[in-house]
Amino acid sequence: AAADEGTPIYIYAATNPENDICSLDSLTKAGISAYIGNGNKRNYRNMARYVRQHIDAKRLFVTPAEEAVESASDVLYHLDEDLSFKTVADYEKYLREQGIYREKAPKIAIVGGLNDPFSGNRANIDSLIVSLQNAGMNVYPVSSYRQRLTFLREIGPDAVIHFAHGRMVMGQADAAVEWLKKRNIPIFSPLSMLETQEEWESDPMGMFGGFMSQSIVVPELDGAIY
């Protein structure tokens, strides 16, 4: 109904043909897709500016939008969301320069498919990094889909924390399990909630459907500890 009345609509990553709706022209759709597809605070900010100028057609007090920038992938990261590291060596060099690295301290790797560290919504990740560092550990947060197992092998962690949404290493699940067995280390899988703790605890169901299977059932195949 809104589209019929002329309201610009674009449903990104539609789940089925019935809700695959777009009333934008191809150039505008491509621009919006570039911002969303590389979700980070800079791109979201510029998407809002783009919408205001090119879709809402505002003319006064307009700040032109910058081009979308590609989000980092297959990298290690830390508390500064503007920094990322392509190699473990570069990451450890950074930790040493910051006076954070501890020689011979336990190594904790953090991986996950549900938490994007570059999206601007990462308070839970940052608090975990700081807490583990304050406990005397070296923390290795990894943002990677294709190279996750490669990073883990190079890091050689004493434990893995997996913010699960599926298997720890998609496409290499059996190899990942064998690697865990060989190293004989635990994999912890804290639950990521899309609501407040109070709302979750008061909900009799707690989790449901695909979210439950991807966060609890499937990770158990990797030996996840909750």
What are these regions (language model features)?
Residues 1-226:
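An N-terminal assembly and electron-transfer interface module characteristic of large anaerobic redox
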